[in-house]
Every structure is written in C-alpha cells, then in structure tokens.
Amino acid sequence: GTYNFSGDLGKATWPACAAFVTALAGWRWAAQGIGLVVLATAVGIFFLLASPVGYPAGPQATSTADRAGNGWGIRNTRGFSLLSTIHAIDNGSRTVFLTFLPFLLLGKGARMDLMGLALGVTFAGGAAGKFVCGHLAERWGIIRTVLVTETATGLGILLLLALPVTPALFLLPVLGVALNGTSSVLYGTVAELVAPERRSRGYGLFYTIGIGTGALAPPLFGLLSDAAGVPVTLAVLAAVILTTLPLARLLRPA
C-alpha cells in the first residue's frame, strides 16, 4: 500500500501541474516539460540500477526456482486465476472510467478548464486509496476489503451519473479511493499464491494481464459509447465492476 501510494502521488500532482502550465504557456510547453522530466528521470534510474549492490546470485536463484513446481511458480492455480480475473476487471474499469470521465463532465456542462482539476482530485483520492486500502486489508482481510471497494466503485459511478457538476467534483476524490484502492490489495495477495523463487515471473504475468486489459477496454467501451452514449457506457461499466463481487467470494476457499 505504501509503495503504491508513493507512485500515485505523481498521478495526483502531474495532471494539476500540466493543467497549470497549459493555462500559462499552452499545451506544447506542458508536453515538452513532462518529456524532459521523464527523460532525466530515466537517465537517473539507469545509473542507479547499474550498481550491483544487493543483486542476488544468479545461478543459486535459478537452481532454487527450478524446484518451485511449474515454470511460473504458481502454487494455487485456481486462486491465481480468480485474482487475475478480478485484477483485469479492476484495471480495465479504471482506465475506461478515466477515459470517459471528461466527456461525462462536459456533457453535464462543465468547463474545459475543470478537466485537469477533476482528474487531479480523482488521482489524489486514488493515491490515498492505495495507502488506506492496504491498511484496511490487514484489518478486514482481503476478501472483505475487495467487496467493499468494488461495491463502492460500482455504486459511486452510478451516483456520479445522477449528480450535477459541482457535487460530482466533490464525489470524485471519494470515488478515486475506491477505484484505485483495490489494486494495492490484489498486488499484495500475489505473493501468497506464487513461490518466492518465481515471484518476478508471477508478478510479470499478473501485471501483463491487468495492463493488457487496461489497454483493450477503452476502445471496446468506446464502440459502446458511439452506439449508446457516455452515460449508458458508464452504467454498463458499473455493472461489470459489480461482477467482481461473486469472484471475490469464490476467492475465499481458493
């Protein structure tokens, strides 16, 4: 939760910073500034990772991993499959919601300059959700936390559809907590289902499933939006999110 929270701080601050620079100097300066910062960060990371300090011994890790069962090290195939399915729905629904949120607000009559604020407060709530839900999972358990966050996400989207612009802006940080909080709970659970020697592979597979769904979902829901409109699309999205509830219940005996 803490690790994911630190990363989401960037998601909360960058949209607001980009909106500020865009308002002062135009979107080209904002895009170029972001590109330069990212490039400098990449160079810094390259030199930091070049240090061999703390690297595990390769042959020993490989020989131990070969004794971990299947090539992926998944100790509970059913549990990993259920967890990955929930992650795919959760990640895909998050990218779809963030894609269509500006269009929903514009349809409600919001000004264009409010879009940066809307995304910023949503990401801020999401950053807090990563931190808060990680601690809630320790107290309530994984299943109960997922049930609460996914229910709150689905119902929150339906409520957002009915609200005018100003109340919707106040709802967005709360919705962001639920929308983004589930992922920190799911990430921590992967380690329990994969052998320690194969966790890099297990996490790689898990992230690939989620990122792939996150990339495919917006175009697919875009087709629905073209046919039925943004409000109907987000209502369908809320229904899809709620399908994670029975999946989370099935995860309990897994």
Give short role names for the model-derived ranges:
Residues 161-171:
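Helix-loop junctions at membrane interfaces in 12-TM secondary transporters
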Residues 181-194:
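Intracellular juxtamembrane helix-capping segments at the cytosolic ends
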Residues 144-159:
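Structural signature of the two symmetry-related core transmembrane helices
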Residues 11, 191-193, 197-230:
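A late C-terminal transmembrane helix in Major Facilitator Superfamily
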Residues 46-72:
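Flexible cytoplasmic inter-helical loops of multi-pass small-molecule transporters
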Residues 17-25, 105-106, 136-137, 221-228:
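Interfacial helix-cap and linker-helix signal at transmembrane-aqueous boundaries
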Residues 78-130:
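Extracytoplasmic gate region of multi-pass secondary transporters
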Residues 3-53:
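Helix-loop-helix hairpin linking two adjacent transmembrane segments in secondary transporters
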